Amino acid sequence: MTISVWTIILGTLCAGVGSVLIAALLARALMARFTQHLLSLAAGALLATAFLHLLPEAFESETQPHSLFLTLLLGLIFFFLLDKAELWHHGHEHGHDHDSSHDHDTGSSLTGSWAVLTGDSVHAFGDGVLVAAAFMTNFSLGVAASVAVLAHEIPHHMGDLAVLQRGLGQGRNALLKLCLAGGVTVVGGLAGFFLIEGHEAWLPFLLVIASSSYVYVALADLIPQLQKRLSAAETAMQVLWLLAGIAMVTVAVHWMHVH
């Protein structure tokens, strides 16, 4: 039990806070020109985790496939509604069009900053629960879920940091608050562990819910941002980074199985 708890804490900490710290480093070093590549990488990681790992694991259980497909459908609708409520999709446009999207006055910037932090916290809690469910199914699946969360949060946190720095002023203050919001992933992971323990029959459904969240974010959020008129070379780079995301998750899971 202790090992499982610490494994979940480490996995959710890397995914939640790690993504914020990496985003801060990349925002300073790479700026916005590599954001599109990160979006492609994240989309590939999310789709690979959902379709190649989480869903197959869920359907290997004795749960009725009809019930799992219904859960997948309801999950997609649920995340769509959260998106509309600006809790899940709270600011996924951040960082992709700063000049037009973030041209707010000082008051609205401050309000937007707290909206971003609230949305990040809700999002992080949900991620933590789903990562915990993956770890409790098997270790390699938990690693895949953590990598997917890490990958798709990095480009979003790069945008979030820009909004928070504008609304809260100092860069360190913005980074600290975003790290605290990302740390809610650990809280979600612990809550998930203690809720699921003794109720392992829920695991297939939680894996499907995790899949629906990953598929929704990839197809409704990330990939539409890549649908622009680009040259053949730029389009090829998008595809290569998408495949790199798929390969990254696949290699990570395979390595965990081998070791």
Q: What annotation goes with each model-predicted range?
A:
Residues 1-259:
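Intrinsically disordered, metal-sensing/regulatory segments
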